[in-house]
């Protein structure tokens, strides 16, 4: 029986790369993003599989519940959930627009949590459910000048690791992908493309492949790239104040 994967933020960047990987393995897809035109183009491009298009802004209240309602109405069984949608903002906390920061919290945390909650019953039915939550190396230390973003990714990592333990008996694996700087439209939205951190950004297809393979193997946490692995490890042993200073330095423009 053909399996189905639900992918958020599917119209570009890592989400688009995940669409390609799942499609190439013959998965049917439920693709979610704000840009309906791009989603419909994906449906046309991958005509060999069934793709359900759900144009939805996950930063809006009730979006996750509406997605679940549509999935149930169409009687779609779900085997894999990829929580990829998210964004960041560069700047001091007090100078960034508070509404944008609250939207970030809602998208990066609340929507991810809510969609996972609503889809868990479906994942349990599959007997071999898989969840991939996209966090970041930002999850491992505080991030001055991206304070809220770093905090949201720390939540994603902690939540995912706890959920992985809870769901072991249900044969559901939870994989947390923690990429460092990656070449996607995230950098332009967050306005970090000219920072030291993004001077050696990885390509989105390589990052997605590593995340996909880890997901299929049922791994827990995967950090992409050797440099990022070293940085995440160092952050665990550095005093928190020192780690924050280092994070602040890499946020400076070249």
Predicted features, each with a name:
Residues 136:
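Residue(s) in the substrate-gating loop at a strand-loop-helix junction
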Residues 116, 152:
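Active-site helix of classical SDR
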Residues 25-41:
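Conserved glycine-rich Rossmann-like NAD(P)H-binding loop of the short-chain dehydrogenase/reductase
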Residues 84-89:
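Conserved NAD(P)H cofactor-binding loop of Rossmann-fold oxidoreductase domains
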Residues 166-230, 241:
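SDR active-site lid
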Residues 92-93, 97-105:
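Substrate-binding pocket helix/loop in short-chain dehydrogenase/reductase
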Residues 11-12:
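Conserved glycine-rich cofactor-binding loop
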């Amino acid at each position: 029986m053909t399996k189905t994967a639900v992918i958020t933020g599917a119209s570009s960047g890592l989400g688009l790369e995940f669409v390609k990987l799942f499609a190439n393995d013959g998965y049917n897809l439920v693709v979610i993003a704000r840009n309906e035109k791009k989603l419909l183009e994906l449906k046309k491009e991958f005509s060999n599989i069934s793709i359900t298009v759900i144009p939805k802004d996950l930063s809006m209240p009730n979006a996750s519940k509406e997605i679940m309602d549509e999935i149930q109405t169409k009687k779609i069984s779900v085997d894999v959930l990829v929580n990829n949608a998210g964004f960041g903002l560069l700047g001091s906390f007090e100078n960034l627009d508070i509404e944008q920061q609250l939207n970030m919290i809602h998208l990066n945390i609340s929507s991810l949590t809510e969609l996972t909650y609503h889809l868990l019953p479906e994942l349990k039915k599959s007997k071999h459910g898989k969840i991939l939550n996209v966090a970041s190396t930002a999850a491992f230390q505080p991030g001055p000048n991206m304070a809220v973003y770093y905090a949201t990714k720390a939540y994603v990592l902690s939540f995912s690791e706890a959920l992985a333990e809870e769901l072991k008996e249900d044969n559901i694996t939870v994989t947390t992908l923690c990429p460092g700087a990656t070449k996607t439209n995230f950098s332009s939205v967050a306005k970090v493309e000219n920072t030291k951190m993004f001077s050696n950004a990885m390509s989105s297809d390589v990052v997605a492949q590593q995340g996909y393979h880890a997901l299929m193997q049922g791994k827990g946490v995967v950090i992409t790239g050797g440099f990022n692995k070293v940085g995440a490890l160092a952050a665990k042993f550095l005093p928190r104040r020192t780690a924050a200073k280092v994070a602040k330095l890499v946020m400076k423009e070249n």
